[in-house]
Amino acid sequence: MSTLPEHISLWGELADVDHELRHVDVGGVRTRVLRAGSGPDLILLHGTGGHLEAYARDIAGLAADFRVTAYDMVGHGWSDLPDKPYTIDVLSDHLLGLMDALDINSAHLSGESLGGWVTAWTAAHHSDRVERLVLNTPGNIADKPEVMVRMRESTLAAVRDPSDETVRRRVEFLFHHKEMVTDELVNLRRAVYGRPGFLQAITNTLVLQDPEVRKDFAWRPAWVGRVTAPTLLLWTDHDPTGGLDEAELLLGWLPDARLHVITDAGHWPQWEKPGEFLRAHRDFLVLGKDPV
């Protein structure tokens, strides 16, 4: 049986770790960035409607081995919300612009859900900028309509009415163990969803759940096969957005990939199983071996 996270607060996780939280100008987009640690660059990307605190339980541990950069993607968190569709190429360009602004020539990339989609696209189209790649529950590789509908409807319901009930339901969707969803995490997400202009911003993100828009960026072997970076697929046994059959698809498409399954977790293994998440990253990115 799972227990509540062993932390006082989101920021309590970073209480004894030197870090910097600031906004960076990325091509005119004011972008919220958190940085900690030293060593090889590792950039963390959150999912749809998310924010950098998705990695609150991981940054301190990762900072022991990496110069960690977590950020709010354009149209997310407390970054700017320009009114345009946030398609995968737009999100990838924002990532590359952030790397330029921070003088990061190349980096390891670890992306969760939508963030995984963005990192894979970036690795396929800008291979010189990516060292190694971690795709963390990238979700709905098979473009299942029911998953797209659920993602769109649950997210819009929470943003249109960011009450404790609707937002908690949206956050609980990410977890296998719902009891691990804290009031603080829900209230943080409510604050994001309540930002002026965020309803239009999330609508601009959810265009990716429209099959007609999605088809131009959908996971397909033609572009996935161009990813030359060694890749770790981090999957779970309770991810509501995609099962192990979808991991097998990517294993067949990616030239240099391996799979590690985190058990007893949902769509947010970095929160539900931070120790195993950290070990997998350290094994693959630092030691150059497959996680066990």
Positions of PLM-derived features:
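Active-site loop/oxyanion-hole signature of alpha/beta-hydrolase fold enzymes
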Residues: L34, A56-A60, T69-L114, V118, ...
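Conserved alpha/beta-hydrolase catalytic His-Asp/Glu region
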Residues: E146, D164-G225
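Alpha/beta-hydrolase fold catalytic core
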Residues: M1-L42, D65-F66, I104-N105, R282-V292
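Catalytic active-site module of serine/aspartate enzymes centered on a nucleophile-bearing elbow/loop
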Residues: D256-V292
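Conserved HGGG/HGGXW glycine-rich cap/lid loop of the alpha/beta-hydrolase fold
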Residues: D25, V29-W78
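Flexible "cap/lid" loop of the alpha/beta hydrolase fold
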Residues: A120-A124, E131-V167
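Short beta-strand/loop motif that positions the catalytic acidic residue
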Residues: V227, L233-W235
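Acidic catalytic loop of the alpha/beta-hydrolase fold
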Residues: H238-G242
